[in-house]
C-alpha cells in the first residue's frame, strides 16, 4: 500500500529504501514513455490547430507526428533531453514518495483522521509533489528545452544548455513556469494518490477473491486509471506550463510554426483561449492520456514492487 497504514505489516522499510524504490520506479518508467512525452510536448507548443485541415500545422496526430519526427530527426529524437529527464524522474520519484510516506505518517500520529482517507491522500500527495517539484524544476526546464528544439540543435549537451541559458537569460530561467507548475501539480498529484488508493479499495471490494491475488496487475490497472482521471482534470495547466517554459526560446521554435511570447500564467491562458479556443487548452491530450496511463500505472507498479521486495528481504534476514 502506498502511504502510511498502521494495520499493514509490509511497510517496515527504511527511508533510504523508500527513496530507492521511488527513484527506480521513475527511472524505468521514463525510459519507456519518453517517445510519448516528446510528442506530447511538440503538440502542446504548436500554435496551429492539430488538424489535417490546417495546412500550416506541422503535427496533427500521434502516428503522423511520430513518423515525421522519425523522418526528420531520426529515432534518437524520441529520447531528446533524456539525461535531464532521467535526472528529473530519479530525483522527483525519490523526494515525492519519501515526502508522501512521511506526511501520511505525520497525519496519522498528529490527528484522529485515518491516514488512508481520500482527503488525506489528496492533501499529502499534492504537498509531496510540490516539494519534489521545487527540488527538480530546473531539470524540468532543461528537459522541455531539449524536447522542444528541432534541427539544427541549439543545445548540443546538457552542460552547453545550462551555460547558454544562464548566460543569455539569467538564473531565473531555470524556474520559468514554476507558478503554473505548482498550481497544476498539487491537484494532479493529489488526485493521483487519492484516486489510486480509492480504485484499489474498489477493486478489492468488487473482486474480493482477486483482490488478494494478482497484486501487481491490480497496482498497474489502478495506477493507470488514476493517471488518466488526474491528467484530464488538470491538463490545461500543464499546457500553460510548457508554453511558459519555452519563453525566450522562440528562435529555435520557428521551424515548427508560429511562436508566441507570454508575460505570465494569466496572459498565457488568455492568449491561448483567444487565438486557439477552448480546444487549444487540450492540445496534446491524446498522447498525454496515453502517457499518463502508462507512466502512473508503471510508477505505482514499480514502487510497490520494490517496496515489497525490500520488505521480503528484511523478513528473510530476520
Curated annotation (Swiss-Prot):
Main location: mitochondrion
One Pfam family this sequence matches: Mito_carr
Subcellular location: Mitochondrion membrane
Residues with PTM Phosphoserine: 51
Solcar repeat start and end residues: 13-106, 116-202, 214-309
Motif (Substrate recognition): 241-246
GO BP: thiamine diphosphate biosynthetic process; thiamine pyrophosphate transmembrane transport
Keyword annotations from UniProtKB, A to Z: Antiport, Membrane, Mitochondrion, Phosphoprotein, Repeat, Transmembrane, Transmembrane helix, Transport
Protein name per its UniProtKB record: Mitochondrial thiamine pyrophosphate carrier
Organism: Bos taurus
Gene (UniProt): SLC25A19
Amino acid at each position: 500500500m502506498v502511504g502510511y497504514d498502521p494495520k499493514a505489516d509490509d511497510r517496515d522499510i527504511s527511508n533510504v529504501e523508500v527513496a530507492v524504490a521511488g527513484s527506480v520506479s521513475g527511472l524505468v518508467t521514463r525510459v519507456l514513455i519518453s517517445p510519448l512525452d516528446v510528442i506530447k510536448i511538440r503538440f502542446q507548443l504548436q500554435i496551429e490547430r492539430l488538424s489535417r485541415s490546417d495546412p500550416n500545422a506541422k503535427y496533427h496526430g500521434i502516428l503522423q507526428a511520430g513518423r515525421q519526427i522519425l523522418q526528420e530527426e531520426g529515432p534518437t529524437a524520441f529520447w531528446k533531453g533524456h539525461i535531464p529527464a532521467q535526472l528529473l524522474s530519479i530525483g522527483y520519484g525519490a523526494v515525492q514518495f519519501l515526502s508522501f510516506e512521511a506526511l501520511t505518517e505525520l497525519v496519522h500520529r498528529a490527528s484522529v483522521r485515518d491516514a488512508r482517507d481520500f482527503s488525506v491522500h489528496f492533501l499529502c500527495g499534492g504537498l509531496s509533489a510540490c516539494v519534489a517539484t521545487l527540488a527538480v524544476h530546473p531539470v524540468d526546464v532543461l528537459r522541455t528545452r531539449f524536447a522542444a528544439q528541432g534541427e539544427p540543435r541549439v543545445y548540443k549537451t546538457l552542460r552547453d544548455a545550462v551555460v547558454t541559458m544562464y548566460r543569455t537569460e539569467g538564473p531565473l530561467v531555470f524556474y520559468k513556469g514554476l507558478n503554473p507548475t505548482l498550481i497544476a501539480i498539487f491537484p494532479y498529484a493529489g488526485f493521483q494518490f487519492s484516486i489510486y488508493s480509492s480504485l484499489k479499495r474498489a477493486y478489492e471490494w468488487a473482486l474480493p477473491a482477486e483482490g488478494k491475488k494478482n497484486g501487481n496487475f491490480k497496482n498497474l490497472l489502478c495506477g493507470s486509471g488514476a493517471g488518466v482521471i488526474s491528467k484530464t482534470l488538470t491538463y490545461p495547466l500543464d499546457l500553460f506550463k510548457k508554453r511558459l517554459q519555452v519563453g525566450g526560446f522562440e528562435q529555435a521554435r520557428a521551424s515548427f510554426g508560429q511562436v508566441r511570447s507570454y508575460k505570465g500564467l494569466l496572459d498565457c491562458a488568455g492568449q491561448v483561449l483567444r487565438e486557439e479556443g477552448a480546444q487549444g487548452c487540450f492540445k496534446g491530450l491524446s498522447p498525454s492520456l496515453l502517457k499518463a496511463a502508462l507512466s502512473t500505472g508503471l510508477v505505482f507498479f514499480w514502487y510497490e514492487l520494490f517496496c515489497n521486495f525490500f520488505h521480503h528481504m528484511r523478513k528473510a534476514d530476520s
